[in-house]
Amino acid sequence: MSDEEEVYSDEEVEEEEVEETEEAPAEAEEPEETTEEVVAPPEVKERRAPVQEEKPPAEMTEAEIAMLAAKKRHEEEEAAKLLDYEQRRVLEKEQIEQELRELKEKQEKRRAEREEDERQFAERRRQDDERRRKEEDERKAKADAEKIRKNEEKVRRQQMMAGAFNGRVEAGAGRNFTVASKGDQAAQFGNLAQAKGGKDVMSKEQMEDAKRNFLAAVCRVQDVSGLLPNDLKERIRGLHARIVKLEAEKYDLEKRRERQDYDMKELHERQRQAARNKALKKGLDPEEAASSVHPPKITTASKFDRQTDRRSYGDRRYLFENPEEEKQASLVRGTGRPPAEWGRKQNEELEQIRKNLEPPKYVEQVKVEGARAPVEPVPLFVPTDDFEPQQVTEDPNVGEEVVVE
C-alpha cells in the first residue's frame, strides 16, 4: 500500500469517528422529537435525494478516494464554519439581551431618580413658601409693633415736653395749645414792627430761660442710693437705651437739616436762574437781576385778565383832567334826495334785480294848484370833512313846521 492510501485510510478513520460522535447526540434527540411530534400537528416532509451507498475503500480507486477525502474535508470546514457562526450568533444575542437589560435597568434607575428629585424639589419649594410666609408675617408683626412703639414714644415725649413747660399733663384735659384765627394773625403780623412788638413773640432771654427750664426738667438728678444692684442695672440699661435713641434722633435731625439746606440752595439757584432769564427776555442786565438782594416782583393779577397801562403818571393825570370828547361825524344837510350811487354796488345782476323789484314811479297826470311841500326846501349840502368843526346841539331833522291850508 502506498503512502497516499495510508493517509486516506487514517482520514477515513477520523471521519468515521466524527460521524459516530455526531450521530450519538442526534439519536439522543430523536426521542424528544418523537414526543414533540405526538403533540404537534403532522408536517409535510420534504423529499430528499436518495443517499448513494458508498463503496468500500477496497473497491474505490485512488481518484475516488482523493475526491472522497476532499469532500469530507470540505464538509468538515463547512460544519466548523456553521458551528462558529451559530456560536457567534448566540454570543451576539446574549450580548444584545445583556445591553437591553442594562438599558432597562438604567431607565428604571433614571425614572426613580427623577421621581425622587421631583419629590425633593416639591418639598423644598413647600418649605421655602412656608418659610417666606412666616418671614412675611414676622416682618408685618414687627413693623406694626415698631409703629405702635414709635407712636407711644412720640406721645410720651410730647407729654413729657408739655409737662416740663406746664408742670404736668392731666388726663383728658384737652389740648394744651391755642390756634390764632387768620384775622388776628394778619392783624398781628401786618408788618415787621407789629411782629416784633407782639406779646406772643418770645425774646432771646425768654427763649434761654425756657431752654434752661426744659433741660432742668429733663436732666433731673437720679437718686440711686436706695436701689438694689439689679434695679441699678435696669436703670443703667434704660439710660443707655435712651441715649442711643437720642443719638439716633440727633442723627436723623442732622440729616434732615442737611437735606433742607440742600433744598434751600437749590430753590435759591432756581430763583436766580428764573430772574436771569426774565431779565434777558426784558432786555435788562441779567447779572444785576440775579444778584439783587431784593426779592423778585410777584404779579398778583394775570396779564391776560387786564391790559397793562404803560403810560406815566403825568399822562394819566392830564387825560383824567382833560377827557377826550368824541367828535361828531359830519352831517349832510338839505331836503334833496341823496345821490343814487350812495351805498349801492355796481353790479349788473343787482341792477337787473332792482329793475324787476322796484315799483313803478308815480307820475302826476293833473297838476294840483296851490300844492306845496310839507317843509321848506333846503338846498343839499354835502360836507367835505369827516367831523364837524363844532359840536352840534340842535337836531338837524327838526325844521320849521309848515301849515298846509
From Swiss-Prot:
Feature: compositional bias, Acidic residues: 1-36
Positions of region (Disordered): 1-77, 100-156, 262-359, 377-405
Biased composition (Basic and acidic residues): 43-57, 262-272, 303-319, 342-358
Function: Troponin T is the tropomyosin-binding subunit of troponin, the thin filament regulatory complex which confers calcium-sensitivity to muscle actomyosin ATPase activity.
Record's protein name: Troponin T
Protein's gene: mup-2
GO terms assigned for molecular function: tropomyosin binding
UniProt-listed PANTHER family: TROPONIN T
Residue ranges of coiled coil: none
Top-level taxon of the source organism: Eukaryota
GO biological process, one term: larval somatic muscle development
Similarity comment: family membership: Belongs to the troponin T family.
InterPro entries: TNNT, Troponin, Troponin_sf
Listed GO CC annotations: troponin complex
